């Protein structure tokens, strides 16, 4: 066991994490040159394209060190994005060490800070690595200082390498073997294995990626999940090198996979503990929690006959993504669709993109909303995620909105614009510290202000230099109201929003004027109104098209003209009583793009 090293790589997007992983795999001969391709561990197309890692992957490698011993290195690749922070914390819990990869030209960024703190909390040894030293803009001295100022890790002995050219990768491995402690665990104790990740395979069912903490696991053993209490028969165990290789057993300290004929992903929850059914461990490994969706949106097929196909596509996605939740809902304006829950904005985008790409779906997405907590007059507390389900105002004592803590990291020049943006979004500044040339701002901010367009606006005011990460803090009471849009006196449920009272009149006006441009003219006047409860706060009218009934009159008597105009008016009035208005798709999309200029 003293020759095993379990480690993961922490880095911000684009700092060269996957490339470094490729080089390490190549150096240890995990794959032949023929099978080697760029970003071996990112298996989904969308992961490659966006250059992000979504699912955790592993590679068990053998490395012959300079001291002549052969070490077993288990590389656990972690997602780098804040939406997947729970997956990151589980990946890190399975390691004893982590390589903190920092781009020698860009310096430290927010997400690597966040994941690094997670690592330090878990008691993981952090080894700083400066990547991309072959770039002309690289400034290793400054970046080392930044690592010490921002993260507080001693970086004087940071290894320098260039994953692209392969320079210094061997030094990274040597330093790692020297600094990262071997795993502790007892092969004699009852089995305890932590599920790092799980995914679905069409042939064998769910494949669980585990780190064995104590005990030994062999095929034909009966295993039990500690969170769900379900038991299964273990069919196969093995390791990934990144290709799967079956093994006779997995013992304490090792990282590998278990196949046990499990049908659904929800039975193998990330962070759960696997133990033997006939000799169970006394308690589970710490840190398991159910992941709760933070952001909700309605997904509707453009063609209503695609509803079943959408359900199937969502179910297939759920096989590989246990954190995706959905339930059918119907809207009088958009027909049948699903209300889906996501971990965050990136997660939502990825799910949408995969539906459109892998399953050829045409989707309409309603504006993303968050979960609100309501305290009712009856004293009960309920949570709603759909604005159109909000009960009557008379039954509600208070509405509480989710508040997040958001950490922003940016160069000094952009502090002003970023602070203005945060204040506009009702943020409260909690902290501000200068570290070298970077500034770190901490704000408490309502999540519903962030979900619409905060990220895009942040990038534009800081010219792309600011990076952010956020975590949920608490539900807090706020003065929120439900804004309804009415067309011709009828409420359109898909357009309801929950907004802050101070912002409501402004949002109402903006929406209504946008709607007026988008609803095609009919034969009668259409009133588009925004209301809060029974109060109309804004109104626009889509004017009717009318025929010139006086065209045949040349000159003639004024009373004759009056009669014709009155008759036309009567007709329009009758039409208005029976007419109904089709709202085009563009109108819904426009609502999503109401920019608070």
UniProtKB/Swiss-Prot annotation:
GO BP term (any one): positive regulation of translation
Has UniProt tagged this entry with the keyword Cell membrane?
yes
**According to its UniProt record, which reaction does this protein catalyse?**
GTP + H2O = GDP + phosphate + H(+)
The record places domain tr-type G at 2-184
Predominant localisation class? membrane
Q: Which residues bind GTP?
A: 14-19, 131-134
Q: Name one GO molecular function term.
A: guanosine tetraphosphate binding
Topology versus the membrane, per the UniProt entry? Peripheral membrane protein
A GO cellular component term found in this entry reads: plasma membrane
Enzyme Commission code(s) on record: 3.6.5.n1
Q: Which SMART domains match?
A: EFG_C
CDD domains attached here?
Answer: EF4_II, EF4_III, LepA, lepA_C
Q: Which keywords, in A-to-Z order, does the entry hold?
A: Cell inner membrane, Cell membrane, GTP-binding, Hydrolase, Membrane, Nucleotide-binding, Protein biosynthesis
* Compartment list: Cell inner membrane
The record's PROSITE patterns line, in alphabetical order, gives: G_TR_1, G_TR_2
| Family membership noted in the UniProt record | Belongs to the TRAFAC class translation factor GTPase superfamily. Classic translation factor GTPase family. LepA subfamily.
Role of this protein: Required for accurate and efficient protein synthesis under certain stress conditions. May act as a fidelity factor of the translation reaction, by catalyzing a one-codon backward translocation of tRNAs on improperly translocated ribosomes. Back-translocation proceeds from a post-translocation (POST) complex to a pre-translocation (PRE) complex, thus giving elongation factor G a second chance to translocate the tRNAs correctly. Binds to ribosomes in a GTP-dependent manner.
Q: What is this protein called?
A: Elongation factor 4
The species this protein belongs to is Methylobacillus flagellatus (strain ATCC 51484 / DSM 6875 / VKM B-1610 / KT)
Q: Which gene encodes it?
A: lepA1
